[in-house]
């Protein structure tokens, strides 16, 4: 993920945030292993589950590496009182490729792979603006 263990601290120190929550992807096996075994690397990241749900700025965000199918989202939201709360799915993995045709249509989604935003991180407020400008409103 970082071009080798020696680069982890260098790149981590370039990211100006207090915490980095890592949702592991298919290229992160070595990094996950280091987080579990190396105290210095462990202090740089918070290792998260494959699918994470947070509420922020009045929206529900479902964060994952792989895109999450609609039926799985339905199960995640089942029994929750969300009323008309916007639900926004953010994933990586696709690197700008299209979402599959089946099972990925009912929720607003953002492929947050770095290739989709000029190799810059997305701002959560920009994602909410995209949602507000979409047909999912």
Tell where the protein language model's regions lie, with residue ranges.
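Core catalytic region of metal-dependent phosphoesterases/phosphodiesterases
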Residues: 1-56
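Conserved beta-sheet core of the metallophosphoesterase superfamily
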Residues: 21, 39-137
